[in-house]
């Protein structure tokens, strides 16, 4: 029979606790602060004091700063353990509050198990789950039966989770989802710090904002400021572009992203790519800058055009993109190679400008014509070397094929003679215009002070007839398979065909001749300078993978 022994129980328990503390060192005994009544049922609950609510007096148990309130509690003094149910409230100071239907508590191990509509309340957020484990010695609370975290704006769910009370940190595992009005996050594993609003990701993770999408398998993210860094297969989907790299950085407020090591910026609309080892992207200005072995890949003639420079800058929307290359520009295509100090590519008009850095006053004074020509932009078509002060290449944007070529100022075409060991066919003039058909250079017009040296052979026996040395106002040249097959001179050409022996060796090259075959890229690797090839990728400090969720199961 239940008796109202409230005050008697308190006195007995307090005395018992004092004697126990004096008698032995170790875990403190659970204290009974109040109860509406007490009884025992040794058959069903051997060794238990059954504490119950009566007349609005609920059961209050205290253990080392933790207060547990309930309607009924089965207290086992010898085990320093109790089970409680009925509107259970567990509080630890003013920092932690748990409400649930049932709770078990081991005072020796300081372990609690709460289940049934569990709610863990903090000043900054609340956790709801079906079953919650609380380890007071390690200041941890964890669940593995699906949980929901709520704050003022954000809802977070996961199958498993652990809360590090001292660190004010949550770790969520398996099917992690964060739903915020401004972004959504899904992850395999996520660590979240409540004071800094910062999240760390481990495993496949995606972040979807209003104007961006991010994927990574390691990373960190400030959920308040919407900025973070991302590693391991990281991708930012941003303004019709994909940004990839070993390490990515992103700031939503600044419309800014950066990438380090093995980066690629892919324009998904025009299918162009820029690679390198460092890049910055500015969404508001619709621009990107890439350095460290930077290389752009564009489609021309249904073929890849590779462009390398110390620095590449892309600006404008996809349909009007401008690509600029600065310093030591080199280009490679299956039927075309090139080199210049700088490059300007307009993807809406299909115009490529290859330019040089102007010579200084001193260089203009002391350089020979050959030395000046060595600094000019240069192209190689087949066996032909073409150079000049400026080179313009234009593509037909409808069929994506090369359409025309223009070389402005000091235009040169040099071709190693196919039979002579030392001879070069040369054409020099002020302006060069070339036409393409189906991507092949078929016609060239050269005007203004045109000079020619050309080795002539018999059609049948391929015997050298002589060397043609001519000056004229202009000429037209027909090519096939990137080789000169016919030349027509215009406006009172002045020249003669001389036997090889009658033309001195020092007169077999036009003034300013400079053969640059050793600069010609043979493959994509040749696009990079020796400095580029020596470049070492700087290691990135990886985010450390955390320890397993639980090393041991909870008993």
Segments predicted by a language model, with ranges:
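Bacterial Sec-dependent N-terminal signal peptides
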Residues: 1-28, 555
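N-terminal amphipathic/hydrophobic interface segments
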Residues: 23-555
């Amino acid at each position: 029979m239940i008796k109202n022994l409230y005050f008697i129980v308190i006195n007995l328990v307090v005395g018992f606790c004092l004697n126990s503390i004096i008698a032995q060192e170790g875990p403190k005994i659970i204290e009974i602060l109040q109860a509406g009544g007490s009884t025992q049922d040794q058959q069903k609950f051997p060794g238990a004091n059954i504490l119950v609510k009566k007349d609005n007096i609920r059961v209050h148990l205290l253990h080392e700063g933790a207060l547990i309130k309930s309607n009924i509690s089965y207290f086992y003094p010898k085990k320093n353990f109790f089970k409680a149910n009925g509107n259970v409230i567990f509080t630890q100071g003013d920092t932690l509050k748990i409400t649930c239907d049932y709770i078990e508590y081991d005072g020796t191990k300081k372990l609690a198990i709460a289940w049934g509509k569990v709610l863990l309340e903090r000043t900054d957020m609340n956790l709801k789950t079906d079953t919650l484990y609380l380890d007071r010695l390690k200041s941890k609370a964890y669940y593995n039966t699906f949980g929901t975290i709520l704050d003022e704006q954000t809802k977070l769910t996961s199958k498993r989770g652990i809360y590090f009370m001292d660190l004010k940190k949550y770790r969520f595992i398996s099917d992690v989802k964060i739903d915020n009005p401004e972004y959504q996050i899904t992850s395999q594993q996520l660590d979240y710090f409540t004071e800094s609003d910062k999240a760390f990701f481990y495993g496949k993770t995606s972040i979807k904002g209003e104007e961006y999408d991010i994927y990574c398998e390691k990373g960190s993210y400030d959920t308040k400021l919407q900025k973070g860094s991302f590693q391991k297969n990281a991708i930012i989907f941003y303004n019709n572009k994909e940004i990839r790299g070993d390490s990515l950085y992103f700031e939503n407020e600044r419309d800014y992203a950066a990438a380090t090591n093995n980066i690629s910026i892919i324009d998904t609309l025009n299918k162009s790519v820029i690679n390198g080892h460092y890049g910055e992207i500015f969404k508001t200005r619709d621009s990107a800058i890439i350095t460290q072995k930077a290389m752009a890949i564009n489609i021309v003639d249904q073929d890849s055009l590779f462009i390398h420079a110390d620095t590449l800058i892309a600006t404008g929307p996809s349909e009007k993109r401008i690509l600029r290359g600065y310093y030591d520009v080199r280009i490679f295509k299956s039927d075309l190679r090139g080199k210049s100090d700088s490059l300007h590519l307009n993807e809406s008009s299909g115009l490529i400008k290859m330019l040089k850095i102007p010579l200084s006053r001193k260089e203009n004074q002391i350089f020979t014509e050959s030395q000046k020509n060595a600094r000019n932009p240069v192209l190689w078509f087949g066996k032909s070397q073409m150079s000049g002060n400026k080179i313009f290449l234009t593509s037909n944007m409808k069929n994506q094929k090369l359409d025309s070529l223009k070389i402005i100022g000091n235009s040169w075409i040099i071709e190693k003679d196919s039979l002579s060991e030392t001879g070069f066919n040369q054409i020099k003039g002020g302006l060069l215009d070339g036409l393409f058909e189906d991507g092949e250079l078929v016609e060239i017009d050269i005007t203004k002070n045109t000079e020619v040296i050309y080795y002539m052979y018999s059609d049948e026996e391929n015997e050298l007839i002589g060397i043609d040395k001519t000056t004229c106002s202009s000429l037209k040249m027909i090519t096939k398979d990137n080789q000169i097959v016919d030349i027509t001179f215009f406006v009172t050409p002045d020249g003669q065909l001389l036997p090889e022996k009658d033309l001195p060796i020092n007169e077999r090259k036009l003034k300013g001749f400079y053969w640059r075959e050793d600069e010609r890229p043979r493959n994509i690797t040749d696009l990079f300078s020796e400095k580029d090839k020596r470049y070492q990728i700087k290691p990135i400090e990886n985010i450390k993978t955390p320890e397993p969720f639980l090393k041991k199961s909870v008993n």
